[in-house]
Structure formats: C-alpha cells, structure tokens
Amino acid sequence: MITSIATTTAGAFEVKSLGFIPYPSQPKRIFFMAQVIFRILAIAFAVASISAMVTSDQNVIVFGMDTAARYSYSSAFRFLVGANAVVCGFSVLSLIFVCLMSRRSEAILEKNYYLFLHDMVMMVMMVSGCSAATAIGYVGRYGEKEITWTAVCDFVGKFCNQALVSIVLAYLALFCYVALTTLAAHKLNHSSSTAAIRQNE
C-alpha cells in the first residue's frame, strides 16, 4: 500500500514537473463545457437580438402622413438593446474568466461565488429588459381598448415583426442565464461542502 501511494505521488509529481495540466474529472469537465456553451449561446442570442432591433426601422404613410417607427422612440426597446449589450460584453469577460478557472486543479470558493453573483445579476437584467419590451410590444400589437390606445402593428408590420424576433432572442439569452445561474449555484454549494469537509479534517 505504501509503495502504491509513493508511486502515485511520484507519478503526479512527474506530470506536474513536465508542465502538463492533469486531465479534469468528468463532473468538472461537464461543468466547464456547459458553462462555455451557455455563455457562447447567450452572446450569440444577445448580438442577434440587438441586430434585429436596431434594423427594425420602418417608414410608412398613414392617412397621407409620412410616419416613422424606430426602436429609439421607445424607452423600453432602448433599455432592451442596452441590456443585451451589457450582457453580451460581460458574457465575453465571464467566458474568459471561466476558461482561466478551468486551468486550476482545485475549485476556489470565492471565485465560484463571484461567478454566481455575476450570472444572477445578468439574469435579473435580462428579466427587466425582456419584461419592459414585452409590455410595450403587447400594447403595440394589440392596443389597449380601455384607454383608447390603438394597435400600430397593422401599419408598421416590419417594425413589429423584427421587434418580436428581437424580444424572442432576448428571452433565449435569458434562458441561458437561468441555466448558468442554476449551474453556478450548484457549483457554489458543492465548493462550500468540499471546503467545510476539508476544514473539519
């Protein structure tokens, strides 16, 4: 038994001395791949949502008057674009952070906490942006008869359709961050349990 342990320790020392990083365990590898995939998807959905919204401008003639529909006329749509931009930027930074964390052989509780906090803030921001844009989009498409607000999508169909696509893409980015927050919470809980066990030993 002592010989086996010594051999294992020597082998590990030789691997580290040659500069190789030990191959991560299966759960850690799955967690890393899920983090990378969901962050890349969140970036892609956020960029696509911004593109759909900023290119949704439409000029139409209504009752003989030249009318323009632009996302910048709505504070809710501007907020959604801003939220997508912030989430996209921080997703790139967090992707780099996750890749750097994966190079360490041991989980660090403090860094897992920061990752969880980041993902939760991004999720809340996307919830705010999607909720605001959905409310305005609903009124624009269906109107509000009780207060005599008329639906405008019958006149500016292109604008409304692209705004709808943008909102759907933003929701997909939101779902990515719901998954990331869940993963980060699970990882944080696991790291806390591991740290507590080591402290009691």
From Swiss-Prot:
Topology versus the membrane: Multi-pass membrane protein
Subcellular localization, as worded in the UniProt entry: Cell membrane
Major localization listed first in the record, in broad terms: membrane
GO cellular component, one term: plasma membrane
NCBIfam families: A_tha_TIGR01569 (TIGR01569)
Quaternary state and interactors: Homodimer and heterodimers.
Name of the protein: CASP-like protein 1F2
Protein's organism: Ricinus communis
